[in-house]
């Protein structure tokens, strides 16, 4: 046993205490995952040393046979998971076992609901890793020595998974890490070596690093005929096959194997929604195995967090979260890419601008989009589940990926005036199929909420004529539509921007009536312009309104209302926008206004402008003045 120095006691970071408490209680029904997590971590440590040794073979010393070993001591009620991988320094131990260094940790804890079933899935996505040891152990001891620091001593870390841990320098002869679990009274099942072998076969079969368990010696004996049978010495026996699942033929892999592999690679307790396994040969040769999760990863909206798939080169693990292999708008995709062409000593910098990387990224992106297109066609209910979970991320696609813009647009879903309710289920193809004869544009509106969009006065003429309008109300929607201006040769047109041109949907009689109304109202328009002054860009007769007295419209050359609000929320400077004020001459309120004296008319005009601004923006710069004017007019009514 290693000789320990003076033990120092330290308190866990607050988040670690929370995670330990939640995990021990939420994951209790799935206790066996502790071995999956610890063996996976040990395999990663061996993989990391193998990668480092590509540029410095001396790191192996006299021990280049990388492995993970799992052993049981029934007398002391312990399980030990050992590796001869990269190991840890004292600082590594403090940072990795005493704190949670992940950014977005506070947001993660904020998502927890108190529902054990839901929280267990979320905790699994967060990555329980090492701390899963405390599901089955009431004390954990870690002994480790770094392979990267020749002068480093060993380190021992010890904790009972409560408020604190102890740490000390020790003498440890060999590099790598030993994790000793002192099992709880109710964890006897894990003292059964056959039980542990079964768990390793279930979760770790694909690992390229051998996972070994001790095979007891067989003493010399005699057979039934009295012949001598030689004994066999005890030895470390490899339990997993070591054949990476993705290297096997698809026809030889069961759905159950794909699902179990997903749980390992994604650290998720749920099964995946769907997956795609592809071997690409030709100029660039690689294999990818890509999964779409059922649930959003907890850190989906944390842009500081690296996202991406795992990268292997010729079955050798290179890195996690290789974001260069998958566009940001597909950051929910889990899985791996295994290249036959990249060098083993590849770095993130080399990946950044590399034609092999680009080919793998483009190929993997198309596979994911094809997978989603097929799901949308074959199973609308499952696709709706995907869209409700990941739709807002996919909406980033048209801005990021010009090449696949049309493919992404086919996958988008929207709420619409065609349906009741805010469910986003209408595709652009659905819309085009329902377009009226002579209609050449796809009409949409962006607002703060579904209700604000559905009840916006600018929809009145569309409702009257039975023209469908897409209703957009997510924060990202204005950004999306600024990059998605056309689909299948149909222009996308906001109903609250610029001149409204319904083309052939306006018959000659409608156009003649509009021109006649504009001419008859010309003097009154001048009166409105004088009353409102520089508060508006222009006043004109509307061809959008049938029930409302007025509305405001953004000029084609100005920033839209929703884009301005988006930039303001991000702390960006936004130029002041003056709106076009459209008036409905037929409305009784407008007719009544025209009989008022100029001072009163001015008050009414400003109230109408404020009302129209509220309907479009949802807020006013000076609500107090609006209330004062309205009170005054009501008193004089």
Curated annotation (Swiss-Prot):
Annotated region (A), positions in chain: 1-348
Molecular function GO labels: ATP binding; ATP hydrolysis activity; ATP-dependent protein folding chaperone; unfolded protein binding
One cellular component (GO) term of this entry: cytoplasm
SUPFAM superfamilies: ATPase domain of HSP90 chaperone/DNA topoisomerase II/histidine kinase (SSF55874), HSP90 C-terminal domain (SSF110942), Ribosomal protein S5 domain 2-like (SSF54211)
Domain of life: Bacteria
Keyword ATP-binding tagged: yes
Region (C): 566-637
Keywords, alphabetical: ATP-binding, Chaperone, Cytoplasm, Nucleotide-binding, Stress response
InterPro entries documented for this protein: HATPase_C_sf, Heat_shock_protein_90_CS, HSP90_C, Hsp90_fam, Hsp90_N, Ribosomal_Su5_D2-typ_SF
Localization of this protein: Cytoplasm
A Pfam family annotated for this UniProt entry: HSP90
Span list, region B: 349-565
Subunit structure: Homodimer.
Function of the protein: Molecular chaperone. Has ATPase activity.
Homology family: Belongs to the heat shock protein 90 family.
Name under which the protein is recorded: Chaperone protein HtpG
Organism of origin: Idiomarina loihiensis (strain ATCC BAA-735 / DSM 15497 / L2-TR)
């Amino acid at each position: 046993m290693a000789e320990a120095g003076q033990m120092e006691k330290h308190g866990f970071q607050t988040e670690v205490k929370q995670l330990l408490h939640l995990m021990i209680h939420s994951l209790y029904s799935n206790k066996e995952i502790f071995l999956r997590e610890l063996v996976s971590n040990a395999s990663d440590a061996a993989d990391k040393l193998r990668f480092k040794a590509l540029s410095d073979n001396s790191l192996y010393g006299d021990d280049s046979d990388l492995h993970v070993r799992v052993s049981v001591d029934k007398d002391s009620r312990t399980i030990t998971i050992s590796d001869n991988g990269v190991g840890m320094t004292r600082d590594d131990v403090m940072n990795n076992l005493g704190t949670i260094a992940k950014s977005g940790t506070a947001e993660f804890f904020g998502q927890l609901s108190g529902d054990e079933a839901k929280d267990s899935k979320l905790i699994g996505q967060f990555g329980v890793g090492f701390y899963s040891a405390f599901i089955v152990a009431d004390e954990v001891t870690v002994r480790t020595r770094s392979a990267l620091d020749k002068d480093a001593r060993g380190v021992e870390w010890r904790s009972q998974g409560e408020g604190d841990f102890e740490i000390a320098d020790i003498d440890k002869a060999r590099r790598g890490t030993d994790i000793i679990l002192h099992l709880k009274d109710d964890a006897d099942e894990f003292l059964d070596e056959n039980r542990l072998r079964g768990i390793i076969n279930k979760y770790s079969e694909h690992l390229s690093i051998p996972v070994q368990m001790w095979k007891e010696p067989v003493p010399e004996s005699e057979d039934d005929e009295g012949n001598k049978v030689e004994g066999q010495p005890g030895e470390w026996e490899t339990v997993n096959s070591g054949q990476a699942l993705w290297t096997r033929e698809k026809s030889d892999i069961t759905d159950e194997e794909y699902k179990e592999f997903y749980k390992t690679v994604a650290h998720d307790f749920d099964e995946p929604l769907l997956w795609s396994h592809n071997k690409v040969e030709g100029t660039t040769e690689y294999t990818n195995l890509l999964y779409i999760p059922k649930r959003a990863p907890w850190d989906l909206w944390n842009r500081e967090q690296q996202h991406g798939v795992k990268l292997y080169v010729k079955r050798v693990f290179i890195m996690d979260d290789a974001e260069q292999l998958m566009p940001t708008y597909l950051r929910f995709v889990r899985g791996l890419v295994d290249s036959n062409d990249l060098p083993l000593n590849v770095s993130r910098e080399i990946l950044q601008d590399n034609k092999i990387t680009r080919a793998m990224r483009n190929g993997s992106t198309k596979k994911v989009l094809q997978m989603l297109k097929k799901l949308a066609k074959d199973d609308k209910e499952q696709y709706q589940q995907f869209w409700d979970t990941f739709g807002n991320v996919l909406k980033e696609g048209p801005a990021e990926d010009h090449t696949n813009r049309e493919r992404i647009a086919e996958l988008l879903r929207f709420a619409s005036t065609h349906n009741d309710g805010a469910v986003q289920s209408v595709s652009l193809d659905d819309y085009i199929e329902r377009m009226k004869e002579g209609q050449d544009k796809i009409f949409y509106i962006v607002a703060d909420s579904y209700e604000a969009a559905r009840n916006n006065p600018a929809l009145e003429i569309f409702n009257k004529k039975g023209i469908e309008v897409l209703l957009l109300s997510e924060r990202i929607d204005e950004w999306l539509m600024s990059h998605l201006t056309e689909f299948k040769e149909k222009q996308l047109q906001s109903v609250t921007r610029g001149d409204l041109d319904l083309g052939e949907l306006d018959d000659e009689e409608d156009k003649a009536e509009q021109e006649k109304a504009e001419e008859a109202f010309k003097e009154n328009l001048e009166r409105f312009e004088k009353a409102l002054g520089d508060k508006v860009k222009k006043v004109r007769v509307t061809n959008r309104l049938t029930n409302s007295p007025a509305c405001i419209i953004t000029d084609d050359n100005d920033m839209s209302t929703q884009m301005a609000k988006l930039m303001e929320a991000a702390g960006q400077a936004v130029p002041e926008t003056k709106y076009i004020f459209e008036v409905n001459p037929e409305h009784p309120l407008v007719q009544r206004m025209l009989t008022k004296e100029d001072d009163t008319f001015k008050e009414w005009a400003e109230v109408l402008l404020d009302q129209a601004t509220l309907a479009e923006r949802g807020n006013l710069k000076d609500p107090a003045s609006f209330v004062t004017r309205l009170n005054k007019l009501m008193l004089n009514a």
